[in-house]
Regions:
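Substrate-binding groove of N-acetylhexosamine-processing glycoside hydrolases
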Residues: 1-264, 268, 272-279
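Bimodal feature
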Residues: 262-263, 312-317
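A short beta-turn/strand-edge loop motif at beta-sheet boundaries
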Residues: 274, 286-290
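Short, surface-exposed beta-strand/strand-loop-strand elements in extracellular ectodomains
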Residues: 290-301
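Solvent-exposed serine/threonine-rich low-complexity stretches and specific carbohydrate-binding patches
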Residues: 304-314
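Conserved small/polar residues in nucleotide/adenosyl-binding loops
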Residues: 318-325
């Protein structure tokens, strides 16, 4: 929205609030930016979120929840729970329409992601025990349900992926589905609010396959192997250059934006080889001005032809689900 504002869209913003729960914080952030974008820009998204959590749950608990919410958003940035099926509703003309497919991740990364979600889920549960009774419903709806249901969704899909390859029992995936159903029942019934939000939350919207128990089927192709890199950086790991950090964006929250005709520099130890492959990961988007978004690289002073990474067509949906597009040079 700051990009929209800086591009001159300053009179009217339109927000679709059809699915208002559990997006209360996001709606508040949007409205605060619409009311006084300079105030939000000055304090930053992290501090704005911190103020929200402390207002709702007290200073001590709010501060403890801040890193949990940031990690929740970071993991969801990599892949939202509803996109974990690695399929797309518009693919009705293909042979794998509505068929849950492997995520393009190695066993090592899957285990790392599952461990991160388990830690998050445990911390959220511990914090719940410190919430006063009159705030338990708010805590469940704003924090506990989104974080724990996301964790269980990842467990359901990723344990199923491992089970397809004979690396895990199917029981863990099935148990995660049951946990999502149980959490949703609590959301709708509540603790002390007389079922105020009864039937508000549905854990199987449109009865799409990604929200159902995963079919017990064996994989027909091997799981992806972990790639090995000579060097690997986040955007903000550059040694020098002209850039601005993008708060909250990127798989490690270290994405940057580079002004037109500016550059950043990265260094790595020399290697004995006649060629290298450079893989650049970027945020998928459309041009704000002009008809293309281009990036150019040079290696040891040798210019590599510019590449246009504007995303469009069916492939753009794949990029948007992963919050990244890539250029291989």
């Amino acid at each position: 929205m700051t990009t929209a504002y800086d591009s001159g869209i300053q009179k009217l913003w339109v927000l679709n609030v059809g699915d208002i729960k559990p997006a209360e914080y996001q709606i508040e952030l949007f409205m605060d930016m619409a009311w006084d974008i300079h105030s939000v820009r000055k304090q930053g998204i992290t501090k704005h979120l911190s103020h929200f959590l402390q207002r709702e749950f007290g200073n001590q608990l709010g501060k403890r929840l801040l890193p949990l919410m940031k990690e929740h958003y970071r993991l969801a940035y990599i892949r939202k729970p509803e996109f974990m099926g690695n399929t797309r509703e518009e693919e009705y003309h293909t042979n794998d329409y509505r068929i849950i497919k492997d995520m393009p991740w190695s066993e090592k990364y899957i285990d790392t992601r599952l461990a991160a979600y388990q830690k998050l889920e445990d911390e959220v549960e511990t914090c719940f025990n410190k919430v006063i009774p009159e705030r338990q419903d708010a805590y469940f709806q704003l924090v506990k349900y989104p974080l724990q249901a996301s964790a269980e969704m990842n467990k359901k899909i990723l344990y199923a992926q491992k089970a397809r390859h004979g690396l895990e029992s199917w029981s863990k995936s099935d148990a995660a589905f049951d946990s999502i159903a149980s959490l949703t029942r609590i959301y709708n019934i509540g603790f002390h609010n007389n079922s105020k939000w009864h039937r508000m939350m549905d854990f199987q919207p449109r009865r799409l396959p990604v929200f159902e128990p995963v079919d017990h089927k064996a994989a027909t192709s091997p799981i992806i192997k972990e790639r090995k890199y000579i060097a690997k950086w986040n955007g903000a790991d550059c040694t020098n250059g002209d850039y601005s950090p993008c708060e909250g964006l990127g798989y490690e929250e270290k994405a940057i934006t580079i002004p037109k005709n500016k550059s950043v520099n990265y260094t790595f130890d020399a290697i004995n080889t006649d060629s290298v492959e450079i893989e650049v990961h970027l945020l998928p988007c459309h041009p704000i001005e002009g008809k293309s978004i281009r990036i150019a690289l040079s290696l040891d002073g040798q210019q590599i032809p510019a590449s246009n990474y504007e995303t469009y067509g069916p492939v753009s949906y794949t990029h948007l689900r992963a919050h990244e597009t890539s250029a291989h040079l």
